[in-house]
């Protein structure tokens, strides 16, 4: 069919070398149909308007690893807050204004001798309220099954080769209990403020497959 778009390849690969996203032409799934039916029912019953539902979706979509990074940075610089996170990470998160819902959040701290990594072996439970949407690899069966059995091997695939004397602990998230890794504070950051420290904290470091970045 003729069109006026610029010349492009039909190999499925973009000029930058990345594959084009597949067309979403398949019929709606069971869960998609259920979502539509639920939205209509909530509206018909006067429980929530379409605008309220969309606002909540926008609020959830706006969450990102930057929220978790702020919590980690404050953990590093504020001894009193650090103890509150250790005692009740859910309450400490709410203290910073993060709405994490009713779930129980547990912070696991990396040290010189212990490295933590999180997974959900059953599905893809993830601290979305602090980190946003999980990466695709976190949801894949390969990661979920292998990181429990051979965590060091999986971490090496992410470029993280831990010394043999460092203990690796794998934490399995559930529907009502989530984990966040507090990465070890990088050396050479004693003079950095909380905002600068938060910029060093990555999503992967809060999952446990990477370290926090070193200052430039």
Please identify what each model-predicted range represents.
Residues 2-216:
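Terminal, compositionally biased segments used for targeting/anchoring and flexible tails
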